[in-house]
């Protein structure tokens, strides 16, 4: 089975940004030729930070959106980040999708923090507040936007579609794909019952925010995905 092993971003200062992901978000960081890699141990994807980029305002009409970091205890993670002076939004349960919070890295790239369990369902023994981000964090999603989900799915026929999540009042739906032989516990891919299962997967999923018919522009910083 192939693996989604990296997200390639062209940034202003690869080493400095990698240090943020290491010091603040608990990833390992190391130099690799002219780039820096930052990632968690395990089968999830790394960030591959390449030189030559410049800091620009990111907007909602761009192809690239965010990364999502899944973890067992969102409240502990946010408390830790605030103690380090990081501006992170208040955790909230977004519809029947997940308990989440948002922040930006020093170059303005969006990061979502997503708890394994919905609000009020976290086990008492989840995570460890002494570990970075409360322990157990992994890169759960790389999120792109699309105006044509049928074309995206056709281009990625070797990936399994694991979940489809409607967010009709905001005018989009979400599709999650992965290189895996696993099947969700509930055969209906729209079932809410699959979502907490999805946030626990050890591999990184490719998430599409589908805005039907949207005309999106390329993101200068997004240099594609690494597959191994």
Regions from the PLM with identified roles:
Residues 1-48, 52, 144-203:
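Core segments of cupin and vicinal oxygen chelate
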Residues 3-7, 45, 61-67, 138-142, ...:
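Short amphipathic alpha-helical segments
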Residues 6, 78-144, 155-157, 162-194, ...:
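Vicinal oxygen chelate
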Residues 39-42, 59, 102:
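Short glycine-biased active-site loop of nucleotidyltransferases that positions the nucleotide triphosphate
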Residues 49-54, 126-127, 204-212:
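Short amphipathic beta-strand starts and helix->beta connectors
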Residues 54-55, 100:
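Histidine-centered metal-chelating micro-motifs
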Residues 59-60, 131:
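Residue-level marker of regulatory loop/turn positions in helix-turn-helix DNA-binding domains and
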Residues 71-75:
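Short proline/glycine-enriched turn/loop motifs at strand-loop junctions of beta-rich domains
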């Amino acid at each position: 089975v192939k693996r989604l092993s990296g997200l390639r971003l062209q940034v202003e200062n690869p080493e400095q940004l990698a240090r943020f992901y290491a010091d603040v978000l608990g990833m390992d960081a190391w130099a690799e030729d002219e780039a820096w890699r930052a990632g968690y141990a395990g089968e999830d994807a790394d960030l591959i930070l390449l030189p030559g980029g410049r800091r620009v305002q990111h907007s909602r009409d761009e192809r690239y959106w965010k990364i999502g970091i899944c973890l067992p205890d969102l409240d502990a993670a946010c408390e830790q980040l605030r103690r380090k002076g990081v501006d992170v939004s208040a955790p909230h349960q977004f519809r029947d999708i997940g308990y989440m919070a948002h922040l930006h890295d020093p170059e303005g790239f969006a990061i979502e923090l997503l708890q394994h369990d919905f609000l009020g369902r976290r086990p008492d023994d989840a995570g460890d507040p002494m570990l970075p981000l409360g322990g157990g964090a992994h890169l759960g999603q790389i999120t792109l936007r699309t105006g044509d989900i049928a074309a995206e799915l056709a281009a990625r026929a070797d990936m399994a579609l694991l979940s489809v999540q409607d967010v009709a009042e905001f005018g989009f739906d979400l599709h999650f794909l992965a290189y895996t032989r696993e099947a969700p516990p509930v055969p209906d891919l729209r079932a809410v019952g699959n979502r907490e299962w999805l946030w626990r997967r050890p591999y990184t999923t490719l998430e599409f925010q589908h805005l039907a018919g949207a005309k999106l522009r390329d993101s200068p910083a997004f240099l594609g995905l690494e597959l191994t």
